[in-house]
């Protein structure tokens, strides 16, 4: 009995250490930088009390550079499943307080496991990224972990919704997986994603560039088109993910949940007769028409800052989730250029995959 008590005490201590990630000091630094911890993010994202964590006590296997003497349970990834509005989702979050959220061979297995479970159960998967990239102490083994993650991203594409949030300085491999998912969220002035950071750019091509210019939320929201949603805070971002999920089905064999609607489907709006000018050379805002047609005049726009000459997003009609694609006469006369075509076609493919 005494031995069992000792074993249980050891387990409880490891569980406590895992819950603290990199420790109290690192958590304080995370908060000082204006960021939440991985566990705080998951708690805010999911319905209260629904999170079930997997592989909480896993540690890395690296013995190089004294790493064998510095093992933290959880190894920088918090993963598991829970519910959003009563619907099952799978989630994993990089813990920046543990080795800068770097990817190891071991914690890559945690991510792959959750990806496989999401695919098997036909449920959306959400990635909360706050990672410096590969763990250099592990060399090629860490990079191999990325290959496994990317493979699962491609296998899940068009089968289950994949959503990524960039919540810190994500470089290298930490950017590639999000780019393979369906939707990316970023936070103004807090989120950055780039293949290599400003220091490497300066060393290689002798060009000075800030983190914001190279890979900030505005850059990817308006220029590269990599990110779909730019938010003002982490709290807003996490709530926006919950809202996006409300428009989506669980998988490609399902349909989006129909919402109760008090908006009369047969209502008429006289303003629709006057929004479009008689002169075809006079611009108007297509969003005015969209908002008058959809339920409760609410339109959840996707990629609002990129290729503004075309509008895409989700809304509801008679309580059913619909995808909307519309030319925007108020910007470049609503012409179809390369960026607008890419923006619209990708959205149409997504809606087609998920019965929207």
Language model segments and positions:
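Terminal-region recognition feature
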Residues: 1-163, 169-176, 180-200, 205-356
